[in-house]
A protein has these predicted regions:
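Mature catalytic domains of secreted/periplasmic carbohydrate-active enzymes
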Residues: 1-325
Length: 325
């Protein structure tokens, strides 16, 4: 459930239209009233909302919790303003205590350190991290590069782009919140549905490398740099066969090859002898979605030989399930 604090000033645009109902005093309770943008948005101490507005926000937000028992409450930006801090704490206490009464696991998503680490999920809008964090984080993004909603002429991502982002995010202890934009009649555009179906096909085969896994000692290896920060996930990432991402579960390490090589030869530095990251013995390697258990040798690197043309992955990543003992 998406909740907003920036509506204190966000209806400013409507203030420019004389006949808009945002200017009608009769609707002041609905719109805030709309304050207009007169502040420096980067200054968390600048011109805070009124006490009346923040009290009203808290009551409304708690009312939503009681009415709908949301599993996740997602706060968009501007919530990091210093004046909101006492109200954020009050809301978190109320929501988490109510969740305990319901016997339900819940979470708060927030940006820009609005909540202290460990009390909410840190969210990056259309962005990723370049490292592992011990606290769960989230990348919220969309199937289109240019829009959050249905727009004629949307610049859609490729299904493989979304899958690759998912793998990278999970390897760094993150979660992916993926948006699609329905048409006005509620139907899902075919372009959106195609991306979801292709993701589903990949996850049906390789989901065990994602669901219920944890991050490994390092998130991965390879030459391709994933930029960190908000609004960075639309940059083209040209992954190579040297780009690997790791997850783990039980006695398995999942090494996802982000671009499968034509010759079928894989070399993983982190699982070789030189880096000394893996102390266990490798018992078996399986390529998910196949019956193949390729030959391997653990030298300076972990060298895996699958043979040319054996795997036809296209632009989708391939998962190696590595069993250790």
């Amino acid at each position: 459930m998406l909740l907003l604090t920036e509506h204190y000033w966000f209806f400013n645009g409507g203030r420019q239209i004389p006949e808009a109902d945002v200017n009608d005093p009769e609707y002041a309770d609905l719109y805030g009233p709309a304050a207009g943008i007169t502040r420096d948005m980067s200054d968390i101490y600048d011109n805070p909302p009124t006490e009346e507005h923040m009290q009203d926000w808290l009551v409304r937000t708690c009312e939503i919790v009681d009415k709908y028992q949301p599993s996740i409450v997602y706060f968009d930006w501007w919530i990091q303003q210093y004046a909101w801090k006492p109200y954020l704490r009050k809301f978190a206490a109320y929501y988490y205590n109510r969740s305990a009464q319901w016997g339900k696991e819940t979470a708060i998503d927030a940006k820009f350190d609005a909540y202290v680490y460990g009390s909410a999920v840190n969210d990056l809008e259309r962005g990723q991290l370049d490292h592992i964090t011990p606290d769960l984080w989230q990348n919220d993004t969309s199937v289109a590069k240019n829009s959050w909603g249905y727009t004629i002429g949307n610049d859609y991502k490729k299904p493989s782009d979304v899958v690759l982002d998912l793998i990278d995010v999970v390897s760094k202890n993150g979660a992916l919140l993926l948006n699609i934009g329905p048409k006005p009649d509620g139907t899902i555009p075919e372009e959106d549905a195609h991306i979801l179906r292709e993701m589903g096909k990949w996850l049906k085969v390789n989901g065990e490398a994602i669901y219920g896994t944890r991050y490994w000692k390092i998130f991965g290896e390879g030459p391709t740099v994933v930029p960190e920060g908000h609004f960075t996930d639309t940059y083209d990432k040209h992954f190579t066969s040297e780009d690997i991402r790791f997850t783990r579960k039980s006695n398995h390490i999942y090494a996802t090859v982000l671009h499968w090589p034509e010759d079928g030869e894989i070399h993983i530095k982190a699982l070789g002898n030189d880096m000394k990251l893996l102390k266990s013995t490798i018992r078996d390697i399986e390529i998910l979605g196949t019956d193949l258990h390729p030959a391997f040798a653990r030298n300076k690197e972990l060298d895996i030989s699958c043979g040319r043309g054996v795997i036809e992955a296209g632009d989708m990543p391939v998962v190696l399930k590595i069993t250790v003992e």
